[in-house]
Curated annotation (Swiss-Prot):
As accessory component of the DNA polymerase epsilon (DNA polymerase II) participates in chromosomal DNA replication. This is DNA polymerase epsilon subunit B. It comes from Schizosaccharomyces pombe (strain 972 / ATCC 24843) (Fission yeast). GO terms for biological process: CMG complex assembly; DNA replication initiation; DNA strand elongation involved in mitotic DNA replication; DNA-templated DNA replication; error-prone translesion synthesis. The keyword DNA-binding applies. Heterotetramer. Consists of four subunits: pol2, dpb2, dpb3 and dpb4. Interacts with dpb3. It is found in: Nucleus.
């Protein structure tokens, strides 16, 4: 396979007089420009593209034009971000200044493919592997505030790139847009589920096992009938529970409700099965979370849209999936609640660092999650203490030159880290200001101060890291229903360890089913409205760190997404951390005595 690719690089397209007809190019151009990049092409611009493809690809245009058109579309999106219509006057300079001709494009792919298929790559030493991974295509950390913002177009049922840049001081309409986006993402996901797809031929075919959603506005005049609704749980000022969708709302009677597996609180999007009463109430029989959709199914539904702004197409991702098999032993070490104002923290950290310093294979990266102070950071009086904590950490790290040289350190802020207002921080949260960590940067060769949440891209794997004490927030705000689910024993009769595992599974299922890291109303969990998309869990990540210091360590696999939490570093007389292997989706929890 390598020889054929090399040949295609060395042999340039034949420079013969060949003309591609616009009508012949139209299907490919439509697929690339319209379906993939949401751009519209008029007749003149299609003619210009056909002429350009004729010159670059010649008689081999059918097999070679798609990568070329992809590069042109990417360049257009970068240069004319707010112009969705590709016009000929603007297209001509784009084609003239295109710096990535087709043969170079193939060469870059060939290089990746050669890396992944040759034995020298698969059998290379650790040092050679790290040198290769330095390329940003293989490893990068995505900041929540630098991700592209996509809006959901409900009429076309597609995501489109927002023309307006998000701001910290968003208008009131941003709150409405935020809720609409959450609703439509989950609603479209439900409709793709086979249980909600009505057979094309009804007649003699049984429809057992399929469900149909009813808009709330359609309940009027249909008292006494049973319906399945979908909407947002809200609490009215008088304390009553309501269900809202995009058009209407209805008050719920949950006195006889049987809840499904998971946690339910105001702000959650739920499926409700029940009967509409003549009094205007909706008597709930069952209440549950939307069905989950696996990552590959979501990516297929999005037509492999580059929703994270990685600038990699499906072919490149396929090559990376093959290449990453050589890195199954590469580990991410995750440590949480690293209080730098506690001397025992440094004792535990040095024990962990020494373990890896003396081993042959050091971790690929070490993720240190806050809070980095045991009390909330205040604008007055905390700055000196906060910086001294990181200076002490830098002094401690100097004892371990091997990991400082070869391991990447990622710092994720927690609830007590700057900046907070009366101990409350908005989500997403900016990275730790560099003023406090300049000594860390001098000691460690590779340091990344990430936002909260952040996404770590490792080859084709997406590892989502979110630091929040979310389990306690769910416990404080969860709703109580009239009936206990069938088959559920008295909670007091279950051992404490099993209760914790049960709650952890509920937590993971709820977050992934909701496709959002913070399914709470703004009064419960304040959010920057214009950046709410950064908290979305759609499509599912390859792996997710739900870092919660109030919960014990766990490792839960659900929907094809391994979810982990190392718990607090210090817990009683033990210190805890986890090793995550993103390629083989394996998680190892460590617990050792101080």
């Amino acid at each position: 396979m390598n020889n054929s690719i090399t040949d295609s690089v060395e042999k340039k397209p034949e420079q013969v007089s060949f003309e591609v007809q616009p009508n012949a190019l139209r299907p490919v151009a439509f697929h690339v420009f319209t379906r993939k990049y949401d751009l519209n092409i008029n007749r003149d611009s299609l003619q210009e593209l056909a002429s350009f493809v004729s010159k670059k690809c010649g008689s081999q245009w059918r097999s070679q034009c798609e990568p070329l058109l992809d590069e042109i579309a990417k360049t257009w999106k970068r240069v004319h971000e707010t112009q969705p219509i590709v016009t000929r006057p603007l297209l001509i300079p784009v084609l003239a200044n295109l710096n990535v001709p087709h043969e170079v494009r193939v060469s870059s792919l060939a290089r990746v493919q050669t890396l992944e298929t040759t034995g020298s790559f698969l059998n290379s030493s650790n040092s050679e592997i790290r040198e290769t991974i330095k390329n940003e295509k293989y490893f990068r950390v995505l900041d929540a505030f630098k991700m592209p913002k996509f809006k959901y177009d409900s009429s076309r049922k597609v995501f489109v790139l927002s023309k307006q840049s998000p701001t910290l001081m968003a208008s009131a309409s941003a709150c409405t847009d935020m809720l609409n986006r959450r609703f439509n993402v989950v609603y479209s996901r439900i409709l793709r589920n086979e249980s909600f797809q009505t057979p094309s031929f009804s007649g003699s075919f049984s429809q057992t096992g399929t469900y149909q959603l009813t808009p709330i506005r359609n309940l009027l005049g249909r008292a006494g009938n049973t319906f399945l609704l979908f909407g947002l749980l809200t609490i009215a000022p008088d304390g009553t529970l309501w269900l809202e969708d995009l058009d209407s709302q209805v008050q719920l009677d949950v006195s006889q409700a049987e809840q499904g597996f998971g946690l339910f609180c105001p702000g959650c999007l739920v499926l409700v099965n029940g009967q509409f009463l003549s009094s205007g109430l909706f008597l709930v029989f069952e209440l549950g979370h939307p069905p989950i959709e696996r990552r590959d199914a979501s990516l297929k539904a999005l037509n492999n849209l580059d929703i994270l702004g990685l600038n990699m197409d499906a072919k490149q991702l396929a090559l990376l999936r093959h290449a990453e098999q050589a890195y199954q032993s590469q580990a991410f070490v995750c440590i949480s609640e690293v209080h730098l104002d506690n001397h025992q923290t440094f004792y535990a950290l040095e024990k962990i660092f020494q373990k890896y310093e003396s081993s042959e294979a050091v971790p690929f990266c070490i993720i240190l999650c806050g809070s980095f102070m045991s009390s909330a950071f205040h604008n007055s009086g905390s700055s000196i203490q906060y910086k001294e904590g990181f200076n002490k950490l830098a002094a401690s790290l100097e004892k371990f030159p091997k990991i400082c040289e070869k391991t990447k350190f990622i710092f994720v802020p927690g609830p007590n880290d700057p900046w907070t207002t009366n101990g409350i921080s908005l989500m997403p949260k900016h990275s730790i200001p560099l003023h406090f960590v300049n000594r860390i940067q001098r000691v460690c060769k590779h340091t990344i101060f990430a936002s909260n949440p952040c996404r770590i891209i490792f080859f084709s794997q997406e590892v989502l890291i979110y630091r929040d004490d979310i389990s306690g927030r769910f416990q404080r705000n969860s709703l109580k229903f009239g009936k206990t689910p069938q088959g559920t024993s008295n909670i007091n009769s279950i051992p404490l360890a099993e209760q914790q595992v049960h709650q952890q599974r509920k937590l993971v299922k709820t977050v992934l089913d909701q496709s959002h890291l913070s399914p709470f109303p703004s009064r419960t969990r304040p959010i920057l409205w214009d950046f709410d998309y950064a908290l979305s869990v759609f499509p599912l990540p390859s792996c997710m760190g739900l870092i919660d210091s109030e919960s014990s360590a766990f490792d839960v696999h659900y929907g094809g997404c391994p979810t982990f939490n190392p718990g607090a570093l210090l817990l009683g007389v033990h210190y805890n951390w986890q090793e995550v292997f993103p390629v083989k989706k394996e998680i190892i929890t460590h617990k050792e005595r101080i």
